[in-house]
Amino acid sequence: MSMENIAKDLEARTIGLDDTFRFHCTACGKCCINREDILLNPRDLYRIAKHLNCTPLDVYQNYCESYIGSSSHFPIVRLKPKGHVKRCPFLKDRKCAVHEAKPGVCAIYPLGRYMKIDSDDYKQGNLDNPVVKYLIQPIECGDNSCEHTVREWLSGFNIALEDQAFIRWHQEIAKIGSILKQAEKKLSAPVMGKLWDTVLILLYLNYDVTKDYLPQFEENASDLMTALQTVQTMMKGV
């Protein structure tokens, strides 16, 4: 699908904060099987680790796997599906074992969200004024016995409408992904592997769950950008 068609599809499924949708979770567990696409951001890893009283590295090593996004050129972490039904590793007896700390994509289902940036700002590399948009996903489980607004649904899960952690994460993906894309053109595969490992460690795993998440993310992102700027300087001579 072309970027233009993707944009049209997003617009078609976008739903306003006070628009309504019908959905009722029946705890059937269907949304937790045949899943290879439960992607985690650093805050998801942090929250799950805190819930399980372990480290983000423990969660990553025991329940996740990673790959490099074909369009983002960025390390992507997903929950590693188990068994022939490809179930979420946290699905236990048809219930979520980390319900109180479930990944954001699971918590807001059947909604999804994306970050919209003005086209002129994007062309100029200005990511400072994004707007968080919400969309309705195809609903393949539960029933339609309850009606909600987007605002009500998110409030029920204590998710802010303007989720700063979500915004900052996607800003960094866009900014760092652009640098990594250029690096791929000039650096050898082994060097790129080390660079991607550095991104994975600093942005996804380098957190103390006894401390607040966002200040640590900002520090990690700053440290990573300093390292990438050094790489950019090196690439000028390649």
What do these predicted ranges mean?
Residues 1-238:
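Short loop/turn segments that flank or connect secondary-structure elements
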